[in-house]
């Protein structure tokens, strides 16, 4: 016997009269919805846009805060970077004669690395850092290679590195300026910054990547800057080169499966380039910075390098440039005023000697009393 087909849906769930009256009522509401409720919907959507925007920025800021707290306060309690794997391989350092580059090298030596290739253009400073490491660690093996990263010819450096078992690389070469000037007002300095911080630092990576991959991979740490996160007026060339290195490093990290690349984007560090001789609330010492930065290896691919700077970077997540510029630019104008006073108004002989030491790495002499120095800094 064939099964009885189910009754029509309308006869069991919705009576015919109810169905007709329901659709009639819905039809009568359509004009009202389009006119009144449609306008209300548009207004609601417009009001939601700033709410979503602010919520998104708060979300980014909150998780950036949690990440910073974890990496620099909680993780050190139980985590240490695995540097033992690089103890018997060479660590190649560019810009390691001053500032962050030098402090980073000393921190690695303190944590057990013993084989270093120091690259820079000042033979005296290279020998000084070499002697300092050997004095603290008698079993250290140090090689030095004199090279100018602004020369444009990397053939000699490429040949020198090609036969080395490279396991760790610190790319901290860089140059900066004192004055805040528009791009093009001082073309010699602009060109030098682009040549050293941009092409020089990038070409150096192309020299170390093949031998490192051939040896089984390794770790690269590149010093960029927080000034490469947002475009900053009067620092166009410097910001552009730091943004270049940040994006280049992120791309390289995804291209080479056996090579880990970490990018450091610090704020102000007490180095010769910034004319700070000691740390403060917002300025950290190179030693403190590098101690925290080395500890973050293996935890993050991009970081400001220390808790102090990570907290400062929260402003980049929270505020758009229309607001952020009123917070950032006064800092740079104050820095320019401070450096100008150091150069022009000091009558203290000891301070004059200090300034002479700061400027001994002059790259491009100019008629504007601005000095470009080789150093490793933000």
Curated annotation (Swiss-Prot):
Gene3D superfamilies: NAD(P)-binding Rossmann-like Domain. Substrate binds at residue 225. Its EC number is 1.-.-.-. It holds the Pfam family adh_short. It is a multi-pass membrane protein. Coiled coil: none annotated. The chain crosses the membrane at residues 35-55, 61-81. GO terms for molecular function: oxidoreductase activity. One of its GO terms (cellular component) is membrane. Keywords: Membrane, Oxidoreductase, Transmembrane, Transmembrane helix. InterPro entries: NAD(P)-bd_dom_sf, SDR_fam, VLCFA-Steroid_DH. The keyword Transmembrane applies. The keyword Thylakoid does not apply. It is an enzyme of class 1 (oxidoreductase). The active site is at 238 (proton acceptor). It is found in: Membrane. Belongs to the short-chain dehydrogenases/reductases (SDR) family. This is Uncharacterized oxidoreductase dhs-5. It comes from Caenorhabditis elegans.
């Amino acid at each position: 016997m064939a099964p009885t087909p189910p009754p029509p849906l309308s006869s069991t769930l919705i009576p015919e009269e109810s169905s007709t009256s329901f659709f009639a009522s819905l039809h009568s509401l359509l004009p009202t919805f389009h006119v009144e409720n449609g306008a209300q919907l548009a207004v609601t959507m417009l009001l939601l846009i700033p709410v979503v925007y602010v919520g998104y920025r708060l979300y980014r800021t909150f998780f950036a805060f949690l990440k910073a707290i974890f990496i620099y306060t909680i993780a050190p309690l139980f985590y240490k970077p695995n540097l033992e794997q690089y103890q018997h391989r060479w660590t190649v350092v560019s810009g390691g004669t001053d500032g962050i580059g030098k402090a980073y090298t000393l921190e690695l030596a303190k944590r057990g690395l013993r084989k270093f290739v120091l690259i820079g253009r000042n033979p005296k400073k290279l020998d000084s850092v070499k002697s300092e490491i050997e004095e603290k660690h008698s079993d250290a093996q140090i090689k030095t290679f004199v090279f100018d990263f602004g020369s444009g010819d990397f053939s000699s450096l490429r040949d020198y590195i090609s036969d080395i078992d490279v396991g760790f690389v610190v790319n901290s070469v860089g140059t900066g300026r004192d004055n805040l000037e528009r791009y093009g007002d001082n073309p010699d300095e602009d060109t030098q910054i682009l040549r050293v911080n941009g092409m020089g630092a990038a070409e150096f990576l192309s020299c170390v990547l093949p031998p490192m991959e051939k040896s089984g991979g390794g770790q690269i740490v590149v010093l960029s800057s927080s000034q490469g996160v947002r475009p900053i007026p009067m620092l166009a060339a410097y910001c552009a080169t730091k943004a270049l290195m940040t994006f280049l490093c992120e791309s390289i990290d995804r291209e080479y499966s056996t090579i880990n690349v970490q990018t450091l984007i610090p704020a102000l560090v007490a180095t010769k380039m910034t004319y700070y001789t000691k740390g403060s609330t917002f300025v950290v010492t190179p030693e403190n910075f590098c101690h925290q930065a080395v500890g973050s290896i293996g935890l993050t691919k991009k970081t400001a390098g220390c808790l102090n700077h990570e907290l400062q970077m929260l402003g980049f997540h929270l505020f758009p440039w229309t607001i952020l510029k009123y917070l950032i630019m006064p800092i740079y104008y104050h820095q320019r005023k401070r450096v100008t006073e150091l150069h022009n108004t000091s009558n203290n002989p000891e301070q004059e000697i200090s300034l002479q030491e700061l400027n001994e790495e002059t790259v491009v002499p100019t008629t504007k009393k601005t000095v470009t120095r080789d150093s490793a800094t933000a």
